[in-house]
């Protein structure tokens, strides 16, 4: 499938409320990724907008997680990987040698599929990033920890046990702690790779509610296998298949009136 075949929504298909001009946060132009001889991503062209939740859906092995790892250059940690094309974060080429990867990963946070708190106290988990960036004042750290835990909807549950080991939290609490840890360095974008797949339904609902609150300040890009989740929480959705973007558009329209038969078949559960 050629790049030009990716389905684009016509303006008349999108409600006027969705046509408000928004700042582009990320642009991907002609991105190709290979693992050795395996062509994992093929000619990806996508743009993401500020203060929106964008969902990336598709069957296992379609390239979703590979793609999200390119956005903060974690892909470079994988042996024998090769990239071609361009990714711009707020107009700046992220693979440019003048752009320190540490700076990019401060601006673009990442929350993984499995909660991965450090084997430290709840407080030290959240304070870790600010300390790395040179903040030592205890009062300032206290403020950051409380603010981040409040933003992650966790403060009331842990405020009396901040110095207990974070590994003693439930799975859902650990994932919200990881979100708080991400927020503590004040990122611009939050990447989430299957953030609720290991959680129970109640914890999943809390994280989804949290994402809705966070998008008033942050841009969120989430990879999910859960189509119902994508439909519930996202503003836009990209459907990946075999390393290609098949369709990308406003979520309500993509789910109710998909323009490509492969999208319709996937949403209907005919494969995947």
Curated annotation (Swiss-Prot):
ATP binds at residues 58-65. InterPro entries: AAA+_ATPase, ABC_transporter-like_ATP-bd, ABC_transporter-like_CS, P-loop_NTPase, PstB-like. It comes from the Bacteria. GO terms for cellular component: plasma membrane. Its EC number is 7.3.2.1. It is a peripheral membrane protein. It is found in: Cell membrane. It catalyses: phosphate(out) + ATP + H2O = ADP + 2 phosphate(in) + H(+). The keyword Cell membrane applies. SMART domains: AAA. It is an enzyme of class 7 (translocase). Residues 20-267 form the ABC transporter domain. GO terms for molecular function: ATP binding; ATP hydrolysis activity; ATPase-coupled phosphate ion transmembrane transporter activity. The complex is composed of two ATP-binding proteins (PstB), two transmembrane proteins (PstC and PstA) and a solute-binding protein (PstS). Part of the ABC transporter complex PstSACB involved in phosphate import. Responsible for energy coupling to the transport system. Belongs to the ABC transporter superfamily. Phosphate importer (TC 3.A.1.7) family. This is Phosphate import ATP-binding protein PstB. It comes from Geobacillus kaustophilus (strain HTA426). The gene is pstB.
